[in-house]
Amino acid sequence: MAITAALVKELRDSTGAGMMDAKKALTETDGDMEAAVDWLRTKGLAKAAKKSGRTAAEGLVAVVVEGGKGVAVEVNSETDFVAKNSDFQEMVGKIAAAALAADDVDALLAADLGGKSVADTLTAKIATIGENMSVRRLAKLEGETVVTYVHNAATTGMGKIGVLVAMKGGDEALGKQVAMHIAAVNPAALSEAEMDPVVVEKEKQVQMDIARESGKPEAVIEKMIEGRMKKFVAESTLLSQQFVVNPDLTVGAAAAEAGAEITGFVRLEVGEGIVVEKEDFAAEVAKAAQG
């Protein structure tokens, strides 16, 4: 695969690596961006392992709870200007309410919304506002108590990040604090048992490669890897993370101290994982001039 300047720039932007290091990483991994990031980490050359490109999608995440059931829905628009539009926000709120009864995005798009489907409602709104929109994803959560939190709220119940927390015991104040923690820290899973084994194995392999670069005895390397993996899991899982409200306790310990148990969570962030290629201003003007 040809290693283009654009690929090198993307890797440099996401890792902070130097130009020659980024080019070598891509050459060694045949242009595979994720593998190149891991290669840089192994060599100690990546300043930040951001494995996704810049997120440029706009829109809102809305959260709704009814009884012990909650749902978070992401509805995308092309610009933040539309996300601030009251008509768009009203539509997102109605879509989120309908999502409580939907199992997935396809079912939600087919759901009735005031006499027409959600899909048809979106089509009509696109025609009115003049900008493309889509329901990207939804996530549901059930529990004894489900608490919501919205970060960067555009209006009640919707914003740039939406969080649901399911609990047994405790009170809403604790749930809100945990939800704010989740919004800020973005844990990968509730506990070690719920972590993606592929992610864990990949991290273990990276740490093995880093440790072996040290040239230390195998017994020492095994201890190094064990310690680093414990730290990785602790930093990645909600219940083991230091609670932002009280760093002396983990989230799990803080919940237990309050007589509560966190049983699940959902976190959706607008545009998360979407990479949108940006044209430079001159190219944008040229395209507009061509109609």
From Swiss-Prot:
It comes from the Bacteria. CDD domains: UBA_EF-Ts. Keywords: Cytoplasm, Elongation factor, Protein biosynthesis. One of its GO terms (cellular component) is cytoplasm. Its main location: cytoplasm. It holds the Pfam family EF_TS. Residues 79-82 are annotated as: Involved in Mg(2+) ion dislocation from EF-Tu. InterPro entries: EF-Ts_dimer_sf, Transl_elong_EFTs/EF1B, Transl_elong_EFTs/EF1B_dimer, Transl_elong_Ts_CS, UBA-like_sf. One of its GO terms (molecular function) is translation elongation factor activity. It is found in: Cytoplasm. Belongs to the EF-Ts family. Associates with the EF-Tu.GDP complex and induces the exchange of GDP to GTP. It remains bound to the aminoacyl-tRNA.EF-Tu.GTP complex up to the GTP hydrolysis stage on the ribosome. This is Elongation factor Ts. It comes from Ruegeria pomeroyi (strain ATCC 700808 / DSM 15171 / DSS-3) (Silicibacter pomeroyi). The gene is tsf.
